[in-house]
């Protein structure tokens, strides 16, 4: 149907249902089949960073061709970060940044990352985190802070962040339904 319910309101003995396509329905009963909700990427927590989203900061890769011949800083230590580091290293300079010393990816992928680091195709920075971002409309460089307090500035065109996904109830949470521990109470 490619239609999402964005709003429901109780009106006397009926429900008014509004969708993202501007359709409106009246129903005597509703069934909410929201599953576990929707998922959103866990975002970088740095004040003001959202202004770079979509132009030089990304939480997913939709078209890898957009990242050709770029200096790319990839944050994360799991399969997504490692897989994209491998793929994008074919045509871009990659800096892989993780808060721990160890990565949590597939063994074969880790082996390939290590090989690429040895030949200079991928630079690995651990254990560290993003400290600041430099740039006006687009990111020009980032500063990372290591666990020992040292900082390092890295010139970069693109920041990719892969810190996993978080569950959101989406619009369901705003419908005014009686909720108990993220579940809807029914009568």
What are these model-predicted stretches?
Residues 36-85, 90, 186-187:
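Glycine-rich dinucleotide-binding loop and its adjacent helix/turn
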Residues 5, 14, 21, 29-37, ...:
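Short, flexible active-site-adjacent loop segments at beta-strand->alpha-helix junctions, enriched
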Residues 27-28, 54, 69, 156:
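Active-site acidic short loop of glycosyltransferases
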Residues 34-48, 165-176:
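Flavin (primarily FAD) binding-site architecture
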């Amino acid at each position: 149907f490619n239609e999402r319910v964005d709003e429901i309101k109780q009106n006397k003995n009926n429900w008014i249902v509004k969708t993202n396509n501007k359709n409106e329905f009246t129903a005597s009963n509703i069934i909410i089949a929201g599953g576990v909700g929707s998922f959103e990427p866990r975002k970088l927590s740095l004040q003001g960073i959202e202004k770079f989203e979509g132009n030089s900061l990304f939480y997913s890769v939709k078209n890898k061709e957009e990242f050709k011949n770029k200096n790319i800083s990839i944050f994360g230590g799991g399969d997504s970060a490692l897989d994209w580091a491998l793929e994008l290293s074919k045509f871009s300079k990659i800096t892989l940044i993780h808060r721990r010393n160890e990565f949590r990816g597939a063994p074969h992928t880790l082996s390939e990352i290590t090989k690429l680091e040895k030949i200079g195709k991928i630079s690995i920075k651990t254990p560290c985190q993003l400290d600041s971002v430099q740039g006006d409309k687009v990111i020009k460089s980032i500063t990372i802070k290591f666990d020992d307090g040292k900082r390092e500035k890295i010139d970069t065109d693109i920041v990719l962040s892969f810190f996993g996904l978080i569950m959101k109830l989406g619009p369901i949470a705003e419908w005014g339904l009686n909720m108990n521990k993220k579940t809807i109470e029914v009568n």
